[in-house]
């Protein structure tokens, strides 16, 4: 019966997940493991988010608001008067945008190395992917990217980029928008940890979508809330393509509560920036400057897989970057965790 499965799924391994912390703890005899592999927020969600979620649980016998109106209003209070669409995590938003604009056989452009889901989702929808390698310093080759976008329906840029951590300068994004005919999806999953603000570009360009998530700085990864700034023309078509009731009532309520707690956001940002600085100063390998809640480290002469295994034996779970096309075999990605997790990592990496 395997013949019934679509070729795009039989010919690829799919999305690569980090090893489970419980498995590492059991394998190496630790009571707890430093979980630094998945770019999560180690702090619990805002009390306001938890309270709102608890209230929403009382009415889960009812279907959620398909228009996500309350969440959209909360987003406007937080960001200003933009148009928003929502989805089940950033992945859900990405997939819906692809489904909205890309026909099978049409071209999508991706700047690599980067988040692998763009290519996975493209393959699922029958799109042809053109990968544009980044420069040696992992900056975007703007000219090559624009050239690749000629005739393409959709392009993806991740800024700050996963896994390299660097941001694309707004002027480079603007040059790309000016030079391409299709739609640019700017993945801003980690932008809350950076100083760069791309939102003003939404006022000037009709071919820009900015994707965001509640999983990172807002600490709601388990509730899967994604959203995007979209131009007016795209919104009704996105809604037609979207999965019905993609966001549940509890997720939407929690997201609204988290958006209202701006002090929690500031505290989390400060925590991440302080530990990013310490990682840059104290890790005895090359650490790439990052605008995200993680850093990428070149662990040469070790491979990324070797470093992950050695750190796991010391009770630290990090991500090997060997699965990122175009990156090479000597990199790991380490997110900022709780203080004790970061301290354990620093002790472990110094004795790799």
Curated annotation (Swiss-Prot):
Keywords, comma-separated and alphabetical: Amino-acid biosynthesis, Aminotransferase, Histidine biosynthesis, Pyridoxal phosphate, Transferase
GO MF annotation terms: histidinol-phosphate transaminase activity; pyridoxal phosphate binding
This protein's record includes keyword Ribonucleoprotein: no
Cofactor requirements of the protein: pyridoxal 5'-phosphate
Any single GO BP term: L-histidine biosynthetic process
Transmembrane segments: none
Pathway(s) of this molecule: Amino-acid biosynthesis; L-histidine biosynthesis; L-histidine from 5-phospho-alpha-D-ribose 1-diphosphate: step 7/9
Catalytic activity: L-histidinol phosphate + 2-oxoglutarate = 3-(imidazol-4-yl)-2-oxopropyl phosphate + L-glutamate
Modified residues (N6-(pyridoxal phosphate)lysine): 216
InterPro entries with a match to the protein in the record: Aminotransferase_I/II_large, HisP_aminotrans, HistidinolP_aminotransfase, PyrdxlP-dep_Trfase, PyrdxlP-dep_Trfase_major, PyrdxlP-dep_Trfase_small
Domain of life from the UniProt record: Archaea
CDD domains the UniProt entry points to: AAT_like (cd00609)
Entry's EC annotation: 2.6.1.9
Sequence similarity: Belongs to the class-II pyridoxal-phosphate-dependent aminotransferase family. Histidinol-phosphate aminotransferase subfamily.
Entry-linked PANTHER family: HISTIDINOL-PHOSPHATE AMINOTRANSFERASE, HISTIDINOL-PHOSPHATE AMINOTRANSFERASE 2
Name of this chain's protein: Histidinol-phosphate aminotransferase
Taxon lineage: Archaea, Methanobacteriati, Methanobacteriota, Stenosarchaea group, Methanomicrobia
């Amino acid at each position: 019966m395997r013949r019934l499965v679509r070729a795009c799924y039989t010919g690829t391994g799919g999305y690569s997940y980090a090893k489970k912390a419980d498995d590492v703890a059991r394998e190496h005899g630790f009571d707890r493991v430093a979980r630094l592999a998945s770019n999560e927020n180690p702090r619990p969600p805002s009390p306001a988010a938890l309270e709102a979620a608890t209230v929403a649980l009382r009415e889960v016998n009812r279907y959620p608001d398909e228009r996500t109106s309350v969440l959209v209003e909360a987003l406007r209070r937080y960001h200003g008067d933009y148009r928003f669409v929502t989805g089940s995590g950033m992945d859900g938003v990405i997939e819906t945008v692809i489904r909205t604009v890309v026909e099978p056989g049409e071209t999508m452009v991706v700047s690599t190395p980067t988040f692998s889901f763009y290519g996975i989702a493209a393959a699922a929808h029958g799109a042809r992917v053109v990968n544009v390698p980044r420069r040696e310093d992992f900056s975007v080759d703007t000219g090559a990217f624009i050239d690749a976008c000629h005739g393409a329906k959709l392009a993806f840029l991740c800024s700050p980029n996963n896994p390299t951590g660097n941001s694309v300068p707004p002027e480079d994004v603007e040059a790309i928008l000016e030079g391409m005919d299709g739609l640019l999806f700017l993945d801003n999953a980690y932008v809350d940890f950076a100083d760069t603000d791309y939102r003003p570009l939404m006022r000037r360009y009709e071919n820009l979508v900015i994707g965001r998530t509640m999983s990172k700085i807002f600490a709601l990864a388990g509730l899967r809330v994604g959203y995007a700034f979209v131009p007016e023309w795209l919104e009704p078509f996105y809604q037609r393509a979207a999965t019905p009731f993609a966001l549940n009532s509890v997720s939407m309520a929690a997201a609204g509560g988290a958006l209202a707690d701006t002090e929690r956001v500031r505290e989390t940002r400060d925590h991440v920036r302080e530990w990013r600085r310490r990682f840059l100063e104290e890790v005895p390998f090359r650490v790439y400057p990052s605008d995200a809640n993680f850093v990428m480290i070149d662990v040469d002469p070790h491979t990324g897989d070797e470093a992950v295994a050695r750190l796991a034996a010391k009770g630290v779970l990090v991500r090997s970057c060997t699965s990122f096309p175009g990156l090479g075999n000597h990199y790991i990605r380490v997110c900022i965790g709780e203080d004790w997790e970061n301290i354990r990592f620093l002790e472990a990496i110094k004795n790799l």
